[in-house]
């Protein structure tokens, strides 16, 4: 490779620049920007081998070319966005759109698409003819399959001009709503009863007083002989057949049987009930009628007045009503001592003593408890039946019984400053005192009745009470 040696001008510039650098380094002076540019150009020229004259010519050519470009530039009228859209749309789709537009324009110009009214009518007629020709023809029917005309003959039953023999009032009279002949007068003139109606009424009364033999036998078999009180007060056994056959028909305007004189208070005469039942149907307008066998059987089956029996109890001798009330009381008292109620019932907590007890009479004064019962012994039994309530028994009087929550009773006790004293007076003084507190007046309605305990359970409860008292006395 041939190495080109630098010229005298290049060596001078290089030497000058090295001298400047040495001067700047030795003195610490600052070179200007123009001087730095010249130094850099000299270095580039020295490396490329160009002279200063060539550099000047290149600069002149560069400036002249820039001027010519600026003079030759003219704005074009081409829409760049339209050209870009054309480039984005493929050529196939553009041809299809153009063809559609062209076909639409041709269709609008075609007279077949928009025909005249005459041509349109002809086209409609031609379509109808073509549809009729395309329909399949019906098959020819043979002689057997032909329709045969049938002329129906209607026969109407003739309407009879004869009036019905039974009148309208007769039907309503059978139902118990119509008027009977001879009982009422219309326009001041009494209607006489015919022989036919009299015989009919007589037969009805006989049927009602004398039931059938089979029915009487059934009554004798089921009920047997009955005691009938006589006028002298003696009881005479008599069967239902005799009493029904020998019963006289007494007329009674009120519809009730005549009162009995002497004899048993609860003795009852079956014939009297039959008479009252019969005459009540005869004399009243809408009473029970005896023309139907159903009512006749009811009259024969009527029983006497019911005696006052005691309250029915179960086999163990326990009244179920008291058991239900005790269950309600137990659930209500358990709610009073529940955590849910103690969180919000401050009135109940204010009446607790140091051990958490509350007088049972205080709970008995609540309206909810009074709606169930006011018996303290029943309340005591309800508390003992609960698993949540603890009972403190005081043998002096049932009014001093106290109850509390069995478990976790200590957190609910309030300080002594916020407590309320429950002054419980003796039971007789509550009713006699005129000036009493509202709480004492609510307790005045309490009753102390002996507990309802069956004989079989009485001994067991007494043993439990004695053992509890002995345990407390020993402690």
From Swiss-Prot:
Residues that bear Phosphoserine: 410
Region Disordered, annotated ranges: 42-292
Gene Ontology CC entries for this record: cytoplasmic stress granule; cytosol
Presence of keyword Phosphoprotein: yes
PROSITE patterns, per the entry: HTH_LA
Modified residues (Phosphothreonine): 408
Domain spans labelled HTH La-type RNA-binding: 319-408
Ranges of compositional bias, category Low complexity: 243-263
Keyword tags: Cytoplasm, Phosphoprotein, RNA-binding
Single Gene Ontology MF annotation: RNA binding
CDD domains named in the record: LAM (cd07323)
Pfam families found in the cross-reference section: La
Biased composition (Basic and acidic residues): 59-72, 119-134
Principal cellular location given in the protein's record: cytoplasm
Protein name, UniProt field: Uncharacterized HTH La-type RNA-binding protein C1527.03
Organism: Schizosaccharomyces pombe (strain 972 / ATCC 24843)
């Amino acid at each position: 490779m041939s190495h080109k040696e630098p010229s005298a001008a290049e060596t001078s510039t290089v030497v000058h620049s090295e001298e400047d650098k040495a001067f700047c380094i030795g003195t610490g002076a600052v070179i200007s920007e123009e001087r730095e540019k010249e130094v850099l150009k000299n270095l580039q020229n020295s490396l490329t081998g160009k002279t200063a004259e060539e550099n000047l010519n290149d600069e002149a050519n560069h400036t002249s070319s820039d001027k010519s470009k600026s003079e030759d530039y003219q704005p074009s009228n081409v829409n760049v966005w339209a050209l870009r859209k054309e480039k984005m749309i493929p050529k196939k789709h553009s041809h299809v759109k153009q063809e559609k537009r062209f076909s639409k324009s041709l269709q609008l110009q075609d007279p077949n698409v928009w025909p005249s009214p005459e041509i349109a009518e002809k086209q409609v007629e031609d379509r109808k003819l073509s549809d009729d020709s395309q329909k399949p023809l019906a098959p020819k029917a043979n002689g057997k399959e032909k329709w045969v005309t049938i002329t129906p003959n209607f026969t109407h039953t003739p309407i009879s001009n004869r009036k019905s023999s039974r009148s309208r009032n007769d039907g309503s009279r059978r139902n118990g709503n119509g008027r009977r002949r001879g009982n009422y007068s219309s326009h001041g003139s009494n209607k006489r009863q015919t022989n036919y109606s009299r015989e009919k009424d007589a037969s009805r009364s006989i049927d009602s007083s004398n039931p059938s033999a089979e029915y009487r036998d059934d009554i004798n078999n089921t009920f047997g002989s009955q005691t009938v009180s006589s006028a002298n007060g003696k009881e005479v056994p008599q069967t239902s057949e005799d009493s029904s056959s020998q019963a006289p028909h007494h007329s009674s305007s009120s519809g009730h049987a005549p009162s009995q004189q002497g004899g048993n208070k609860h003795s009852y005469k079956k014939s009297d009930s039959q008479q009252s039942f019969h005459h009540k149907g005869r004399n009243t307008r809408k009473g029970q009628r005896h023309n139907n066998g159903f009512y006749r059987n009811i009259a024969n089956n009527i029983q006497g007045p019911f005696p006052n029996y005691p309250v029915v109890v179960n086999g163990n001798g326990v009244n179920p009503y008291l058991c239900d009330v005790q269950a309600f009381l137990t659930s209500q008292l358990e709610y009073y001592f529940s955590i849910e109620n103690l969180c919000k019932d401050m009135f109940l907590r204010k009446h607790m003593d140091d051990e958490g007890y509350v007088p049972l009479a205080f709970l008995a004064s609540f309206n909810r408890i009074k709606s169930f019962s006011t018996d303290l012994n029943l309340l005591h039994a309800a508390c003992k039946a609960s698993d949540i309530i603890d009972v403190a028994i005081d043998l002096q009087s049932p009014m001093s019984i106290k109850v509390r929550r069995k478990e976790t009773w200590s957190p609910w006790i309030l300080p002594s400053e916020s407590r309320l004293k429950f002054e419980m007076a003796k039971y007789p003084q509550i009713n006699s005192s005129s000036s009493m507190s509202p709480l004492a007046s609510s307790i005045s309605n309490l009753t102390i009745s002996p507990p309802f305990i069956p004989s079989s359970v009485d001994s067991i409860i007494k043993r439990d009470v004695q053992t509890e008292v002995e345990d407390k006395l020993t402690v």
